[in-house]
Amino acid sequence: MLKTVHQKAGRHTRPVRAWLKLLWQRIDEDNMTTLAGNLAYVSLLSLVPLIAVVFALFAAFPMFSDVSIQLRHFIFANFMPATGDVIQRYIEQFVANSNKMTAVGACGLIVTALLLMYAIDSALNTIWRSKRTRPKVYSFAVYWMILTLGPLLAGASLAISSYLLSLRWASDLNTVIDNVLRILPLLLSWISFWLLYSIVPTTRVPNRDALVGAFVAALLFEAGKKGFALYITMFPSYQLIYGVLAVIPILFVWVYWTWCIVLLGAEITVTLGEYRKLKQAAEQEEADQP
């Protein structure tokens, strides 16, 4: 009886072990942690230019003036670790200084922000091992669309949410709205990762695989955010070492950890499709044998 149970358990866990082995093999071959380090470096260089471009877009639309403040607080409260308020103050100072630049400097900011998107494109297509390339004009159009429409859509959604919350009939739904707002960061992360894994690769990505990989990445992102905040709160020894500069290594580590999660979700998405193809090929080979 016990032997039968072990045999059945082995049959059920064998595919999982094979898939995990394939996942680890791909992570090792793609040098995922090195790719994450490259993206973290480019992100830190592009962070202020990217935020400056986004805020400039909001400034161009007076209707979004109040929403931009809400969006700023929402991002730093839900997508940054416990020191988000400190990082927010520094970044806002940097952005305020960048607003004093000339037209040439502003163009440099835009180019730097677009370089981050190019780096993300290259890293994801390296993981998908896609040799296809988009026309440069098409790639630029996609990057610019993400850079402009993304913040505006986020601002519009926050404006609609604020309007609905201000309605009288919505006061009876406070409990429901509170519960929705709690899971909103997870949902936004899931949708963002899904769009990233579906649109950026130059090869076709099965929608189901992208949803699974994005969901795992979103869960890891939320868990990592909570764990990182707990570590900062419970073990403040880094403050004794770095003092007032403690926020710098925290930001570096958080950006690197975030890119590790993003690329791991991409590896999971790719591995799901590759494992399915290998399994189908093995079954076809067995069927062809006399």
From Swiss-Prot:
Transmembrane listed as a keyword: yes
Compartments, as annotated in UniProt: Cell inner membrane
Cystines in this chain: none
GO cellular component: plasma membrane
Name of a matching Pfam family: Virul_fac_BrkB
Keyword Nucleotidyltransferase: no
Residue intervals passing through the bilayer: 44-64, 104-124, 140-160, 183-203, 210-230, 244-264
Spans within the Cytoplasmic topological domain: 1-43, 125-139, 204-209, 265-290
Residues exposed to the Periplasmic side: 65-103, 161-182, 231-243
Topology of this chain in the membrane: Multi-pass membrane protein
Main location: membrane
Keywords from the named record: Cell inner membrane, Cell membrane, Membrane, Transmembrane, Transmembrane helix
NCBIfam families on file: PRK01637.1, yihY_not_rbn
UniProt similarity note: Belongs to the UPF0761 family.
Listed PANTHER family: INNER MEMBRANE PROTEIN YHJD, UPF0761 MEMBRANE PROTEIN YIHY
Protein name, UniProt field: UPF0761 membrane protein YihY
Gene name of the record: yihY
